[in-house]
């Protein structure tokens, strides 16, 4: 249900239970893009290791297993809202209202500034902005009508 948010999920899932190979592979792909940016910024990989290194994993399956084994992630509910046919993502939760404009947009801003390609990160921004009713990224450029609500204006000039 988190992929589209249109169909309700019947129960309120824990974030821990939503960890799947699909999401972990997307996380790995985004991390690869982020690591390319880290190289351009000349930051040591030892300062910011890859997600696979950090979680002592080697692929999406092992990362999924590792994250599901972390006790501190248990008991955290996904940011969802109750609707008639179950639950849908709550696009007003801080997972969206903070993590997109001050997280992914921050990374994307530096990627633009340092000419690093971010197709997977872009796909998440596009998905989120559509569901949040915001416009940050238009045709690969951070020039949407809501971009001034983000940190991008301080990075890209």
Predicted region positions:
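NAD(P)-dependent Rossmann-like dehydrogenase/reductase catalytic/cofactor-binding core
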Residues: 2-17, 21-157
């Amino acid at each position: 249900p988190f992929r589209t948010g249109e169909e309700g999920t019947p129960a309120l899932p824990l974030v821990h239970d939503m960890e799947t190979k699909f999401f972990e592979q997307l996380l790995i792909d985004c991390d690869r893009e982020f690591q390319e940016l880290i190289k351009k910024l000349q930051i040591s990989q030892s300062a910011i290791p890859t997600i696979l290194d950090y979680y002592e994993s080697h692929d999406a399956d092992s990362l999924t297993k590792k994250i599901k084994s972390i006790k501190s992630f248990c008991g955290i509910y996904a940011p969802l809202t109750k609707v008639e046919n179950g639950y849908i993502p709550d696009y007003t939760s801080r997972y969206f209202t903070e993590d997109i404009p001050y997280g992914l947009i921050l990374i994307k801003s530096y990627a633009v500034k340092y000419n690093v390609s971010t197709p997977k990160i872009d796909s998440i921004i596009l998905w989120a902005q559509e569901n949040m009713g915001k416009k940050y990224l238009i045709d690969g450029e951070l020039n949407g009508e809501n971009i001034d609500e983000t940190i991008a204006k301080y990075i890209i000039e």
